[in-house]
């Protein structure tokens, strides 16, 4: 099955004809909100319904699944999100939960999406390590696809750009790394740390991909990942 994955749109909805080839499934790993309105929930709801949703519906695929990121505080309103992006529609929102996608061939793929990130600053969906461990303990074992906004600690989580706050150290999520080693999903697609390693990195039996499309300066520099699973 061919899928397309991307993350960290920050309001940039890439031209469909230029960036997307036909596939079955598109996965978006959070930080969808435009930076200039991310804190205005009324404007964000309007943008999600009138701009983001039609864009997703225009993508050349059968299904779009997306999760929130730390810049998507409006997505804490689960009632609104589930009403606009239900599981039985083309465009589905997952909030730390599972979904079974049935492919054109009839094969079922188990998917779990989680928005949570390690704590820093006053952003959405961020928790202390003790809480993250409890949250990640609910991730099922042997998933086909895990969608996470945050990246696991120790696996390609060093910023590669030469920017003033780059320490050259691993800055990923330790409870997430532990959960992945225990749960062993086949694929992990993530973002959040824009310019870390975008190649396939193996975590045990898990193939991890950073699918962010932005640089640390919020410029669109990476193409969406297209992969057959």
Language model segments and positions:
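Binuclear metal-dependent hydrolase catalytic cores centered on His/Asp/Glu-rich metal-binding motifs
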Residues: 107-145, 165-174
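A short secondary-structure junction signal
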Residues: 121-126, 150, 155-162, 200, ...
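Binuclear metal-dependent phosphoesterase catalytic core
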Residues: 98-105, 175-183, 187, 194-229
């Amino acid at each position: 099955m061919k899928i397309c994955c991307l993350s960290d749109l920050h309001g940039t909805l890439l031209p469909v004809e230029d960036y997307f080839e036909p596939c079955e499934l598109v996965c978006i790993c959070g930080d969808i909100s435009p930076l200039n309105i991310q804190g205005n929930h009324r404007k964000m709801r309007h943008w999600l319904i009138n701009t983001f949703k039609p864009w997703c519906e225009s993508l050349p695929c059968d299904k779009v699944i997306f999760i929130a990121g730390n810049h998507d505080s409006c997505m804490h309103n689960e009632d609104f999100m589930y009403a606009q992006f239900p599981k039985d529609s083309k465009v589905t929102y997952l909030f730390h939960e599972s979904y079974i996608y049935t492919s054109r061939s009839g094969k079922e793929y188990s998917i779990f999406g989680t928005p949570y990130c390690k704590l820093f600053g006053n952003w959405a969906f961020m928790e202390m390590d003790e809480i993250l461990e409890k949250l990640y303990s609910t991730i099922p074992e042997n998933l086909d696809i895990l969608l996470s906004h945050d990246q696991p600690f120790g696996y390609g989580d060093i910023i590669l750009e030469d920017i003033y706050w780059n320490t050259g150290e691993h800055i990923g999520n330790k409870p997430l790394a532990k959960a992945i080693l225990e749960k062993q999903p086949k694929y992990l697609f993530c973002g959040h740390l824009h310019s870390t390693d975008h190649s396939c990195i193996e975590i045990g039996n898990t193939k991890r991909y950073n699918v962010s499309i932005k640089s640390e300066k919020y410029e669109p520099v990476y193409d969406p990942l297209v992969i057959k699973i």
